[in-house]
């Protein structure tokens, strides 16, 4: 038995360390619950040695070029598969069929050209399918019809020129942005429950009413960066809208109250980068629930009819997005100034409703504007001039009259002789002549191309937001969609950090996430605790200014629940490394104790054999003849002490030998038991 210990020890060590060493593919990181991150691995195929109990597999940015029928064999429990940012050009028929439990599939940023009826065969439980940023030109009719449980479908940034009818009764989000779909046929969307529809950057000139006839549950509509010349009339019928994005439709030069009537539920409105010179005066009446307004990069004419805007923003609960880019264009005395920084007097409103006679040596020049009925009159003191001094003759102030006809680039957009043109995605831009600078060439340069002393308001850091909400007493869901949309850097991976603010352990925990995730659930938290969560780009060097978003959330008290959401686990294999190491140390200690016991037992058995007359290793000539020499009393025997055998066993020996001639057998020693 003891001789087998050296053979069993390596086997026991292999069994103890096997799951931690052999269960994770090379170049990957494995963590619980059953999540494999292959972020540093480079290979043209999917790793083959993935543990069969894997729930989440992340192989983004691995250089994968092809998939075959056996790429995902032996992974029946896989629920989340991230293949984004690879070089996959085609998907074999039925390649995902072994993944019967797959719910999330991310193929963003590959080189796919076509989607067939067999591409997603067998994915009956698929809920999220991301196909954005590919080269897809053709989708066969019925390619998604078998995906009965699909909730999100993203096809943005492809090369689609036509779209087959979509019959997805459970779909909640559909993103078709930035394709070449110049028109969408009525009835093409059989998605009665869709909540968010994104049609940005398609080049649409109008929206057909039949397109929205079945969208009874629409809350979020994005039609930005198109060629719309006015607010589509069909929008008035979407009374459930809470978010509307019209940004980048540079041909829209006017917002009429009747265009937006019936949208009382609206909470977020984006009318930035249009050609607006004014805004409807009754925004609070039109949108009583409005929380966020974006109106940046419009050529506003900051005269009296617009004087209500600043006080309304400051006094209401509405947040103005990008206030540093919401500036005046006209008149020249206000050009380039922040709209929120203007006082009532800066808008050139008449002091009274009647003409006042004020002694002055200069002629009175009034702005050709009408007094807003909602503004209270302001009385002038006798020492104050009635109006501002006339503008320099080189640039005459514009008058308030009929809004010009919609054009690609509205007239008088650029000041001081600047040339207006449309930039990328139809954004207005001005080419300024020598000596002038600014968004609309409103600032004059001095000698030596030094800017004029006009105060320039420093641009505050951008505010990126996170949506954090509790999922269970031990988990928080972090919404990354707004952060990804608002970030100005190219994101490949994200760093998510969190810490417990209400507990004794406030150590920072860091996770690495792919940039393709729209949300992430942080698990293994403490119930009834407040956590701080931050997200930032992952990369060497310092985080760019304004690219870190943080938020706080509180987990609810503990409740009995049998459901735990399947999410990605923490990065790092520290628990998997500690457990095998402790097992190895314990096995080594047990082996050492067993070996020592075997050695002592062997020596004791050898001593017993010698006492019984067996020939031992140290037998003399007389013992070979069958004659045993009597024990001679040694020095220790005369002292009455015990004598130690060569084998190490302690024995009792007689105090005196037999006086005979030595023919009788001596008294044998009795070893201790």
Curated annotation (Swiss-Prot):
GO terms of biological process kind: cellular response to hypoxia; cellular response to redox state; negative regulation of epithelial to mesenchymal transition; negative regulation of transforming growth factor beta receptor signaling pathway
Pfam families on file: EGF (PF00008), LRR_8 (PF13855)
Intervals, Extracellular compartment: 24-575
Residue ranges occupied by any LRRNT domain in the UniProt entry: 24-51
Subcellular location: Membrane; Secreted
Residues passing through the membrane, by range: 576-596
Keywords: Disulfide bond, EGF-like domain, Glycoprotein, Leucine-rich repeat, Membrane, Repeat, Secreted, Signal, Transmembrane, Transmembrane helix
LRR repeats: 52-74, 77-98, 101-122, 125-146, 149-170, 171-191, 193-214, 217-238, 240-262, 265-287
Domain Fibronectin type-III: 460-558
A single Gene Ontology CC term: mitochondrion
Entries under InterPro entries matching the protein: Cys-rich_flank_reg_C, EGF-like_dom, FN3_dom, FN3_sf, Ig-like_fold, Leu-rich_rpt, Leu-rich_rpt_typical-subtyp, LRR_dom_sf
Signal peptide interval: 1-23
Tissues in which the protein is found: Expressed at highest levels in aorta, at intermediate levels in kidney and placenta and at lowest levels in brain, heart, liver, lung and skeletal muscle. Within the aorta, the strongest expression is found in the tunica media of the proximal ascending aorta, the descending thoracic aorta, the abdominal aorta and the coronary arteries. Within the kidney, expression is found in the interstitial cells.
Segments for region (Disordered): 358-404
Feature: compositional bias, Pro residues: 390-404
Major subcellular site: membrane
Domain LRRCT: 298-351
Topological category with respect to the lipid bilayer: Single-pass type I membrane protein
Biased amino acid composition, Low complexity: 358-370
Residue intervals of the EGF-like domain: 405-442
Side Cytoplasmic, residues: 597-673
Modifications after synthesis and translation: N-glycosylated. N-glycan heterogeneity at Asn-117: Hex5HexNAc4 (minor), dHex1Hex5HexNAc4 (major), Hex6HexNAc5 (minor) and dHex1Hex6HexNAc5 (minor).
Positions annotated as glycosylated: 101, 117, 273, 500, 528
Subunit structure: Interacts with TGFB1, TGFB2 and TGFB3.
Protein name (Swiss-Prot/TrEMBL): Vasorin
Organism from which the protein derives: Homo sapiens
